[in-house]
Amino acid sequence: MKRTYQPSKRKRRNSVGFRTRMATRNGRKLLNRRRRHGRHSLVDL
């Protein structure tokens, strides 16, 4: 049986990448939250 997590850089970029976050209002809200919180990294890649 195949494992559930089959990592792919392209899929990851397209779902949690910076430009994807910037494309929607909620994504921008998320980035601003992380900025306010002082995160070292805004997106997990």
UniProtKB/Swiss-Prot annotation:
Gene Ontology molecular function terms on file: structural constituent of ribosome
Biased composition (Basic residues): 1-14, 26-45
Keyword set, alphabetical order: Ribonucleoprotein, Ribosomal protein
InterPro entries, alphabetized: Ribosomal_bL34, Ribosomal_bL34_CS
Domain of life: Bacteria
Pfam family, one: Ribosomal_L34
Any single biological process term in GO: translation
Positions of the UniProt region annotated as Disordered: 1-45
NAD in keyword set: no
Cellular component aspect of the GO annotation: ribonucleoprotein complex; ribosome
Similarity comment: Belongs to the bacterial ribosomal protein bL34 family.
UniProt-recorded name of the protein: Large ribosomal subunit protein bL34
Naturally occurring in which organism (per UniProt): Chlamydia pneumoniae
Lineage: Bacteria, Pseudomonadati, Chlamydiota, Chlamydiia, Chlamydiales
